[in-house]
Amino acid sequence: MTALAAAGILTASAREKVFFFVAHPDDTIACAGTMFLMKDKYELHVGVLTHGERGCGEAGYRDGSTKAKRTLEEEAAEAMVGAKVHWFDEIDGDCYANRDVCRKLAALLQELKPRAVFGMWPLDYHLDHATSCMCLQKAVGIAGMRDRIEFYIMEESYDSRTFVPAHYVDITDVVERKRAFIRQHVCQNANDAMCAQEIADGEMRALRCASWMTNGNRGNVERFAVYDGKPQGSRCIFNELPPPKGWSQDWSTAKPSKYTPEGGMK
């Protein structure tokens, strides 16, 4: 075993892959802290459905300036966690889980063979977010990976309505790095408002952990749900991350909730 392997830092070729699929540049702020915790152990990939072309109004969409800005901002942010970005070039606000994009995504999944995939909440208030999850759901099926991949859902602070978390990740030790990640998205972070809101939401998630409040801890947390189809076997990627400090549950055997398109969370 090499010194790097002994330290838990593997070469890119030896790492398992983790794939995140989102609708817009900046959507991975929902899981950026977790990505920082994963970056030295896993090979990270991010698929982005659109370039967020309409994120600064129609004028910026028509002249292409918003697309150019947000593409550069996303590439810079994902470079901080060592993730490779894969663009799907659909149009912000006008994207669908159509055959071509789902097949393109399935082909990428077959190429990468990720251990785990992360998508957006399928009941999200923002239709592009929900669409991106539908694309990922269909692509996992097309790729023949439905019963042999870990499939998780990230919580988007602003729009993940009725979100029911199964896993909590303590990002307190990397929260300043997450701030820097969010601030790469300059055109969406006017007056640092997006950064302030996301960090405050993470602090509130920590306070909602009853065991944290009992033990008087303060920190920052990201939350994730489990999508139906994930095998509930001996492997769970969250078991390889540190649980929230003071967590009182049996972290490895706590039964997660699961989302099903027919019945919601159960």
Language-model features: locations:
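Active-site rim/loop-helix segments in enzyme catalytic domains that contact anionic ligands
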Residues: 1-113, 141-146, 236-249, 253-263
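Short, conserved beta-strand edge motifs with alternating hydrophobic and charged residues
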Residues: 47, 118-120, 151-155
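A structural signal for well-ordered alpha-helical scaffolds and beta->alpha junctions
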Residues: 67-71, 98, 102, 129, ...
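Non-transmembrane alpha-helical segments in soluble domains
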Residues: 75, 137, 179-183
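Proline-aspartate-enriched helix->loop->beta-strand connector
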Residues: 105-123, 132
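Short Gly/Thr/Asp-enriched flexible loops that form oxyanion-binding sites at enzyme active sites
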Residues: 127-141
